[in-house]
Amino acid sequence: MADSVTVRQLVKATKLEVYSGEEYLDQRQVVLSDISRPGLELTGYFNYYPHERIQLFGRTEISFARNMSSEERLLILKRMATEDTPAFLVSRGLEAPAEMITAATAAHIPVLGSRLPTTRLSSLITEYLDSQLAERRSMHGVLVDIYGLGVLITGDSGVGKSETALELVQRGHRLIADDRVDVYQQDEQTIVGAAPPILSHLLEIRGLGIIDVMNLFGAGAVREDTTISLIVHLENWTPDKTFDRLGSGEQTQLIFDVPVPKITVPVKVGRNLAIIIEVAAMNFRAKSMGYDATKTFEKNLNHLIEHNEETDQNSSGDK
């Protein structure tokens, strides 16, 4: 988890324009993902002013400010420009009032702009800041994108996670991270995984060493990050352990208190794990779309049992 993000990093990531204060972009730090739209503050009410947030001015705020006198506008904007305020941001390609530039420059605050509508701009910046400021954890496993579904493969060392990922890449899927996966919570129900920068695009195969997946298979074989939708746990098969054969038992694993669906796949000589995991991802997607083969089978089986019981009863009655 990063404690802060510089305004320059924000500008680069979200493609913002710099109206003024280029020299302050590295000095100003963003510590909160929340954004403030200063409505009451423009009327002079500062009792609960969130000065440590980015101040976003949309069409409403700019229109209201233009109805003030120049002196009143400058006075209000100077009160808003505190030493903790990261930046002033103007949406919809609107022109920043001259008094905003003056007040911001005096307080060493950059003034930024974007052509995006206010709501979309707010969502874009909040999403970026959430991803950068969120708490991060490291998990042991391999993260692969299979048909657009983020699948986290876990299991003991030596069980075959990296080799399985390599075969999945050969089958056209994309690698995100091998061995160590950095995860963070994007929102209440979304967990995102990525590779640590030093391990990005790399895969370790016993006997071969470290291989660069992007150089060997091309840019289409890797991704920077993905939402973790499914966990596949590889476990060595033992005769005394019972594994779910029908897939009727639903498992989950908590990551940051978010339950992520999980299946356990027994590892045994001769089993093609890559194909099994690929099919598991497709089956999970089918369930998400409302089709569950297990439930369909159980329903048909129950109908068949009921039919056979009725047939037996009728046969007994005839006798």
Swiss-Prot record:
Pfam families from the UniProt entry: Hpr_kinase_C, Hpr_kinase_N
Co-factor requirement: Mg(2+)
Reported regulation of activity: Kinase activity is slightly activated by fructose 1,6-bisphosphate (FBP), and inhibited by inorganic phosphate (Pi), but FBP prevents kinase inhibition by Pi. Dephosphorylation of P-Ser-HPr is slightly inhibited by FBP.
Assembly: Homohexamer, arranged as bilayered trimers. Six HPr molecules bind to the hexamer at sites that overlap two of its subunits.
Family listed: Belongs to the HPrK/P family.
Function: Catalyzes the ATP- as well as the pyrophosphate-dependent phosphorylation of 'Ser-46' in HPr, a phosphocarrier protein of the phosphoenolpyruvate-dependent sugar phosphotransferase system (PTS). HprK/P also catalyzes the pyrophosphate-producing, inorganic phosphate-dependent dephosphorylation (phosphorolysis) of seryl-phosphorylated HPr (P-Ser-HPr).
Name this protein carries in UniProt: HPr kinase/phosphorylase
Protein's organism: Lacticaseibacillus casei
